[in-house]
Amino acid sequence: MTTIDVKVLDPRMADQLPAYATPGSAGLDLRACLDAPLLLEPGQTQLIPTGLSIHIGDPGLAAVILPRSGLGHKHGIVLGNLVGLIDSDYQGPLMVSCWNRGLAAFTVQPLERIAQLVIVPVVQASFRVVDDFGASERGEGGFGSTGQR
């Protein structure tokens, strides 16, 4: 298992470190490090601190911040940037952009689980300029080219 360095920026978060809920979990819950409840009106976006910083350190890894499915489905709370990418060399605070795309106001409570952190492998590519590509079955077929329903 890979070890990731975590820096606790707020002492309240020392007992709230991201952890896998089950042996098969891919995501680690991130919590809102707030002093008081935060009201998100419909259409409003707020940047919410997690009270943590991470340093992945391994260029073969990155992290993505993803929405929690229950918050999105039940309350319309998703990420303002849709997906957050944390590069392996980033060492700053983890922040979550929460967007209320729902029709009702939503209150984010202190220490509420607001997003998930998933560690993913990264392959860095190098690019080579070519005049043409080798033939493939699909060719330049784009949207809708592989069939319908």
Curated annotation (Swiss-Prot):
Cofactor(s) needed: Mg(2+)
Enzyme class, first EC level, given as a word: hydrolase
Function in brief: This enzyme is involved in nucleotide metabolism: it produces dUMP, the immediate precursor of thymidine nucleotides and it decreases the intracellular concentration of dUTP so that uracil cannot be incorporated into DNA.
Gene name for this UniProt entry: dut
NCBIfam families: dut (TIGR00576), PRK00601.1 (NF001862)
Family the UniProt entry places it in: Belongs to the dUTPase family.
Chain residues that bind substrate: R68, S69, G70, N81, L85, I86, D87, M95
Pathway(s) of this molecule: Pyrimidine metabolism; dUMP biosynthesis; dUMP from dCTP (dUTP route): step 2/2
Matches recorded under InterPro entries: dUTPase (IPR008181), dUTPase-like (IPR029054), dUTPase-like_sf (IPR036157), dUTPase_trimeric (IPR033704)
UniProt-listed Pfam families: dUTPase
GO molecular function: dUTP diphosphatase activity; magnesium ion binding
Any one GO BP annotation for this protein: dUMP biosynthetic process
EC code: 3.6.1.23
Lineage: Bacteria, Pseudomonadati, Pseudomonadota, Betaproteobacteria, Burkholderiales
Keyword annotations of the record: Hydrolase, Magnesium, Metal-binding, Nucleotide metabolism
Name under which the protein is recorded: Deoxyuridine 5'-triphosphate nucleotidohydrolase
PANTHER family in the record: DEOXYURIDINE 5'-TRIPHOSPHATE NUCLEOTIDOHYDROLASE
Catalytic activity: dUTP + H2O = dUMP + diphosphate + H(+)
